[in-house]
C-alpha cells in the first residue's frame, strides 16, 4: 500500500471514530480507585450485598498486588496511572438496563451508534444485539424465538438483579478470578455493564449475538464484563465491536 493510500485510510478511520458528543452524565465518580469509589458504584447500581462485598474484596487484592511487568507478548503496563482514570460514568438517559426498542433511545445516542455503522440489516441478522455507552448498556434486544426457548441475553447489571444465583456462581469464580492478576482485581472492583448470555440445556443458538461498546468521555475507563453460561448443546460465539475515539489522552 502506498503512503498516499495509508494516509487516506488513516483519514477515513479518524473521520469515523474521532468525534465526541457533548453530553452530561447522570453520575460519575472521581478519578482513581478507592473504597469510596467502589461503594459509590455499587450504591448507584443498587446492588445486593454479595456483589458489593465481592467488589471490595477485589479492591483489597488490587491494592496488594504489584503491577505486572513480565507478561509474555503483552505491552509494558507499568506506567498505567489508575489515579488519572475515571472508572465509572453513567450516561444521562431515562431507561437504565438497556432500551428494548432502538427508537426509545435519545436521539444523540442513536446518532452516535449510527455513525459507527450499526445498520438495521445487521441487527436483523443477529440473535441479539447490545450496545454500551460509557459505563452502561443503553440498548439490549434478543430475538423473540430465542427468548421462548429460555435463552437469556441481557446486560450484566440486570443479570445481577434477575439471575443472582447464576451470576453468583459463575462471576469471576473459575475462569479469571480477581486473584489472577492486578488488572483482573481492578476489573472485579469497578466492572460495569457488559453482556450476560445463558443458553439452557438441549438448546442450540445458531446465530451470533453482538455487543458494541462506545467510550465518549475523556479520561474514563470502561470495564464491561461478559459472562457466558452455555449449558446447551451449542451457541454461536458472541461477537463484540469496541468503537472508541482516537484518543489523545489516557484511557483504559
Where are these regions (language model features)?
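Glycine-rich and polybasic anion-binding loops at the starts of cofactor/ligand-binding domains
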Residues: 2-245, 251
Amino acid at each position: 500500500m502506498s503512503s498516499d493510500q495509508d494516509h487516506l485510510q488513516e483519514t477515513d478511520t479518524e473521520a469515523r471514530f474521532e468525534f465526541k458528543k457533548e453530553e452530561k452524565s447522570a453520575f460519575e465518580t472521581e478519578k482513581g480507585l478507592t473504597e469510596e469509589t467502589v461503594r459509590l458504584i455499587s450504591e448507584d447500581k443498587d446492588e445486593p450485598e454479595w456483589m458489593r462485598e465481592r467488589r471490595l474484596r477485589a479492591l483489597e487484592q488490587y491494592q496488594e498486588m504489584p503491577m505486572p511487568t513480565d507478561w509474555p507478548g503483552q505491552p509494558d503496563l507499568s506506567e498505567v496511572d489508575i489515579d488519572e482514570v475515571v472508572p465509572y460514568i453513567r450516561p444521562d438517559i431515562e431507561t437504565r438496563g438497556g432500551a428494548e426498542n432502538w427508537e426509545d433511545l435519545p436521539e444523540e445516542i442513536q446518532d452516535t451508534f449510527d455513525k459507527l455503522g450499526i445498520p438495521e440489516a445487521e441487527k436483523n441478522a443477529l440473535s441479539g444485539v447490545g450496545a454500551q455507552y460509557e459505563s452502561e448498556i443503553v440498548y439490549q434486544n434478543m430475538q423473540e424465538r430465542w427468548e421462548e426457548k429460555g435463552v437469556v441475553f441481557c446486560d450484566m447489571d440486570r443479570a445481577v438483579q434477575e439471575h443472582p444465583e447464576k451470576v453468583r456462581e459463575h462471576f469471576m469464580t473459575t475462569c479469571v478470578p480477581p486473584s489472577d492478576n492486578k488488572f483482573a482485581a481492578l476489573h472485579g472492583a469497578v466492572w460495569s455493564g457488559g453482556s450476560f448470555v445463558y443458553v439452557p440445556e438441549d438448546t442450540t443458538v445458531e446465530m451470533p449475538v453482538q455487543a458494541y461498546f462506545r467510550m465518549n468521555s475523556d479520561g474514563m475507563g470502561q470495564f464491561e464484563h461478559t459472562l457466558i453460561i452455555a449449558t446447551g448443546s451449542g451457541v454461536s460465539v458472541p461477537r463484540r465491536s469496541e468503537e472508541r475515539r482516537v484518543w489523545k489522552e489516557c484511557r483504559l
